[in-house]
């Protein structure tokens, strides 16, 4: 599991930052990539990475402001041109389907794959499979805005090889089935339950993504015990009043969430163009006074998300 920042600017692009997009790479787990918001020129940013558009199977849209969605029509069109694109699901607030369909219709663009739309209305579970579950909750912005919590389900414990050796289980398919927790039958007819040969389950990883919002209790609920929290940081700590007025957060707001909710690593994104160079690094410096595992995200930064412990 890896996370890559394709755009980290707030409102409009700057010389060093494109507008919002995050890629959650689940290649080892699902052979898929999920995008969170698709700002203008996202497909240009993707060209600078190893991401293949056909691997993108799910897109999660936090809200419908232009700097978070204007890249959708172009990306969807290019994904079609490149072929081999399977079904795609877009999760987002009311209006996202209308925006996409209108853009495609007016430009007479036809995509070669089905697009499913899931409208975000209430807090709770929006996706689940055997490996992951995704939850959403309403944030506090000028338009309906949602945060996301991606939860990897617990992983099976390690196979207890010393115990396996006592039963002379041969290498091969039987050992693999035992590791998967299944019941196997040995050549002498003895049955072994794989669950008896596994160590304790290991908790999966949790990634929380918070875009445009004022501080609100829902952020904490989404961020609880997250291995990675990505949080908007439009303003520095001295601009609390301005952040409140414009329905945004400061770097200190993000750091407090991370500190108070047992977060592993905090990444600051959605950075105003006023914070370049030393001013940008100051955001990170100030946030680290509250939560030391804080990182200022830059475009194309790529981080592996490892299992805790």
Curated annotation (Swiss-Prot):
InterPro entries associated with the record: Metallo-B-lactamas, RibonucZ/Hydroxyglut_hydro, RNase_Z/BN
UniProtKB keywords: Endonuclease, Hydrolase, Metal-binding, Nuclease, tRNA processing, Zinc
Residues that bind Zn(2+) 1, according to the entry? 63, 65, 141, 212
Question: Which Pfam families does the record cross-reference, listed alphabetically?
Answer: Lactamase_B (PF00753)
| Textual note on the cofactor | Binds 2 Zn(2+) ions.
What highest taxon heads this organism's lineage? Answer: Bacteria
Q: What class of enzyme is it?
A: hydrolase
Query: Which residues are the active-site ones?
Result: 67 (proton acceptor)
EC assignment: the record states 3.1.26.11
Q: GO MF annotations for this entry?
A: 3'-tRNA processing endoribonuclease activity; zinc ion binding
Q: Give residues annotated as binding Zn(2+) 2.
A: 67-68, 212, 270
Q: Give the catalytic activity.
A: Endonucleolytic cleavage of RNA, removing extra 3' nucleotides from tRNA precursor, generating 3' termini of tRNAs. A 3'-hydroxy group is left at the tRNA terminus and a 5'-phosphoryl group is left at the trailer molecule
Cofactor dependence: Zn(2+)
Tagged with keyword Cell inner membrane: no
User: Which CDD domains does the annotation name?
Assistant: RNaseZ_ZiPD-like_MBL-fold
Question: In which family does this protein belong, per the annotation?
Answer: Belongs to the RNase Z family.
PANTHER family assigned: ZINC PHOSPHODIESTERASE ELAC PROTEIN 1 (PTHR46018:SF2)
Q: Any idea what job this protein has?
A: Zinc phosphodiesterase, which displays some tRNA 3'-processing endonuclease activity. Probably involved in tRNA maturation, by removing a 3'-trailer from precursor tRNA.
What assembly does the database describe for this protein? Homodimer.
| Protein name (database record) | Ribonuclease Z
